[in-house]
């Protein structure tokens, strides 16, 4: 199969995927991934997505999410490339098992079963369905690849008809975003929610997006002003930190507006500050509290808004210290404090532990 002639654009996309894991896995695993890519390419050859592009770009995108955004290993990357092969081609599960092993075949089988259940899941309540997905799978890779699959489908949803887009977006909101949350995949959860809102409430989505854009410079200046004394003191105390200011997600702002029946201007915490300390695991808890003390020396905290997930992590593994303080000009600001290890878990979810 190594003599296979693959179009330049597809090959370029595959090479981009390889760069995300090339220094993390051995030569044998790389060969296996190449074999799974070539198998998927032949299985989907000539098939196009609704957007008109070759179907193989979808499994390539899913594999890249799995490797780069979730941080999984070679088995998951291989299965992400093959995830639609049994469902959409003549290739049988036995063939997958023979070529790629029992573990890979079980994951592909799990992914195929989930697709079948979703097709007939109209009457199943979202919460029951989420529980069923979690218990259905002996291997967490199945759920994580399914989330990556849904994320790519949401990113490319624009090519579908409006009714179909709304249906998929609603399903994403009630099933997949909470599932990502349950597994601690906060970045993926947030993106799924924002993309779902874009198709379920497009007017609200674009209104909030536009206003966030319009207030970008003002927000950046405020964050700079807020952080100035903190940065000086943190450095003086000898902490090595990275500090980021980021706007809250469009979905979370919309949720607050709806719940409190207020407009965009009245949402008091439209952004959050994240302080990540480069501490050794032995000192990370005390360092986070010391940084908390520095922040609250400058800005008065709201005691009702303190969340200590360092002493008691969330069930999905999330660890962080959250506080809301009164910043300059009487604005409330949310501050999240965590170590690099905690941040890795917050970004990659429980996958950071398991795989």
Please annotate each region the language model reported.
Residues 31-38:
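N-terminal glycine-rich anion-binding loops that anchor highly charged ligand groups
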Residues 38, 64, 106-109:
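Generic alpha-helical structural context detector
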Residues 81-88, 93-110, 185:
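Hydrophobic or amphipathic alpha-helical targeting/insertion segments
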Residues 2-27, 41-49, 56-69, 78, ...:
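Nucleic-acid processing machinery
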């Amino acid at each position: 199969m190594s003599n296979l002639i693959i179009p330049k654009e597809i090959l370029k996309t595959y090479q981009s995927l390889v760069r995300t894991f090339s220094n993390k896995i051995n030569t044998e695993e790389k060969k296996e991934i190449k074999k799974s890519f070539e198998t998927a390419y032949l299985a989907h050859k000539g098939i196009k997505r609704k957007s008109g592009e070759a179907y193989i770009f979808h499994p390539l995108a899913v594999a890249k999410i799995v490797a780069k955004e979730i941080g999984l290993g070679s088995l998951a990357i291989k299965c992400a490339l093959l995830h639609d092969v049994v469902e959409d081609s003549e290739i049988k599960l036995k063939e997958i098992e023979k070529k790629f092993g029992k573990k890979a075949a079980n994951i592909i089988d799990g992914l195929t079963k989930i697709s079948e259940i979703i097709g007939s899941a109209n009457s199943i309540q979202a919460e029951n369905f989420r529980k069923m997905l979690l218990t259905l799978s002996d291997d967490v890779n199945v759920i994580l690849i399914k989330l990556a699959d849904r994320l790519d489908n949401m990113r490319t949803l624009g090519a579908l008809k409006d009714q179909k887009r709304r249906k998929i977006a609603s399903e994403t909101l009630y099933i997949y975003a909470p599932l990502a949350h349950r597994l601690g995949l906060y970045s993926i959860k947030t993106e799924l929610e924002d993309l779902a809102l874009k198709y379920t409430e497009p007017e609200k989505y674009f209104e909030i997006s536009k206003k966030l854009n319009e207030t970008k410079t003002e927000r950046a200046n405020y964050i700079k002003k807020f952080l100035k004394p903190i940065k000086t003191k943190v450095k003086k105390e000898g902490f090595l930190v990275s500090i980021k200011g980021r706007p809250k997600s469009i979905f979370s702002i919309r949720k607050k507006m709806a719940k409190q029946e207020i407009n965009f201007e009245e949402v008091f915490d439209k952004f959050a500050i994240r302080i990540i300390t480069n501490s050794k695991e032995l000192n990370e808890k005390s360092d986070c509290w010391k940084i908390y003390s520095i922040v609250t020396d400058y800005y008065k905290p709201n005691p009702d808004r303190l969340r200590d997930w360092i002493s008691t992590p969330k069930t999905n593994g999330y660890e962080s210290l959250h506080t809301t303080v009164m910043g300059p000009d009487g604005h409330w600001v949310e501050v999240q404090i965590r170590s690099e290890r905690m941040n890795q878990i917050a970004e990659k979810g429980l996958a950071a532990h398991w795989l």
